[in-house]
């Protein structure tokens, strides 16, 4: 009986902490909208935008690749170039890049083939190679699985006109393209990920980056030692913001919301991605990640329901479960719809309750082992560093070097 009362106590405590987090997320959302209005006012006063270099690694024929690439060629921006990089000359993504770039010949475009990345973190190496050929002072990096609106560059770059700002990053909404499991990941991006970012921005300001978009000044990048500084970190997007903040620059959360295309065809693909993200935050933000175990709601509601029924208090159990479900519905509406405008978060809010329970399982699992999977590579980790990357019969240890192959092609 004592154990059951303890479990009810844990459920009550979890309900309290998740409710406090919901309140903080709401306050963070209010701050986001206030900052967005100020950013829009400042944007309307900008007369001259600096030239920009957009850096985009590509890998294989991803879903909606052509549409995703076209969004970057259709920017309402006066002067910019796009650099693409792949590991192999025969990467099928490069055929799509060439096809799209020919249709937008007015946008300067360069294509690099890097060869096998000699650094444990392949994206960091790819960004480093592209930055060497980038002609402009402002670099905008983005993952290959994002879709952007024509005003993307204007809204992301504008804060960098402030000399004190060294980096800008964005929140994003998930776009499901592959069914139920993919949908869980997508709504997690729109709600859970966004809520965490809003609360961090509210409590301490932005001290990290989000991989789908990072805009950075070359001078700020040079201050932290360039992309090579990130070469053996697992969470290179987090670290670049962390280091630029530590170097004395401001990191800004843009008002722009981008779309992150999610195509995870089955449970295993979804799990590998969720597990990798959880591992990333566990190592890059260990205290915050540990505390995030208290922001889930549904696990505590279910725990309270089971324990209270066992004690003969079904009313209490139903109240705890009801509070948990209501908490997740409100978070889905206030953050998923209210901030990133994800229609799924508004109409299919029940999906986020399932995602919340799954998120707790992933969080707990992140404390097991020291390995993670990304694309066709397996990583062995020690702290926030990669100690070994294995893929397709090859392995790359941290600190080792390789001979990169670079075949830059360009057309104007």
Where does each model-flagged region fall?
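Short aromatic/hydrophobic "clamp" motif used to bind/position activated sugar donors
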Residues: 127, 139
């Amino acid at each position: 009986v004592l154990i059951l009362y303890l479990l009810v106590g844990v459920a009550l405590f979890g309900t309290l902490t998740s409710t406090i987090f919901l309140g903080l997320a709401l306050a963070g959302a209010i701050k986001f909208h206030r900052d967005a209005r100020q950013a829009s006012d400042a944007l309307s006063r900008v007369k001259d935008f600096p030239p920009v270099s957009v850096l985009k690694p590509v890998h294989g024929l991803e879903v909606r690749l052509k549409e995703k690439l076209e969004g970057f060629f259709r920017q309402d921006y006066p002067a910019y170039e796009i650099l693409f990089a792949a590991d192999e000359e025969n990467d099928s993504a490069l055929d799509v890049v060439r096809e799209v770039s020919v249709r937008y010949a007015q946008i300067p475009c360069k294509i690099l083939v890097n060869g096998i990345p000699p650094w444990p973190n392949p994206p960091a190496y790819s960004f480093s190679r592209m930055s060497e050929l980038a002609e402009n002072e402002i670099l905008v990096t983005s993952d290959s699985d994002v879709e952007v609106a024509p005003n993307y560059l204007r809204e992301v770059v504008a804060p960098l006109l402030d000399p004190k700002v060294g980096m800008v990053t964005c929140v994003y909404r998930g776009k499901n393209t592959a069914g139920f499991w993919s949908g869980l990941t997508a709504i997690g991006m729109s709600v859970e990920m966004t809520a965490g970012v809003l609360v961090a921005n509210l409590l301490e300001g932005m001290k990290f980056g989000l991989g789908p978009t990072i805009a950075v000044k070359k001078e700020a990048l040079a201050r932290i030692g360039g992309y090579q500084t990130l070469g053996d970190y697992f969470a290179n997007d987090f670290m670049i913001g962390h280091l630029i903040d530590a170097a004395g620059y401001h990191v800004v959360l843009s008002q722009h919301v981008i779309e992150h295309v999610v195509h995870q065809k089955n449970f295993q693909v979804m799990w590998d991605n969720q597990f990798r993200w959880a591992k990333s935050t566990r190592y890059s933000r260990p205290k915050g990640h540990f505390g995030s175990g208290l922001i889930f709601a549904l696990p505590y509601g279910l725990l309270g329901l089971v324990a209270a029924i066992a004690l003969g208090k079904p009313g209490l159990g139903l109240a705890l479960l009801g509070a948990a479900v209501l908490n997740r519905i409100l978070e889905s509406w206030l953050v998923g719809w209210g901030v990133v405008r994800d229609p799924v978060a508004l109409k299919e809010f029940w999906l986020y309750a399932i995602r919340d329970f799954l998120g707790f399982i992933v969080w707990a699992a992140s404390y097991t082992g020291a390995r993670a999977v990304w694309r066709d590579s397996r990583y062995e980790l020690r702290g926030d560093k990669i100690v070994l990357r294995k893929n397709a019969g090859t392995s790359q240890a941290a600190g080792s070097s390789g001979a990169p192959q670079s075949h830059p092609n360009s057309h104007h």
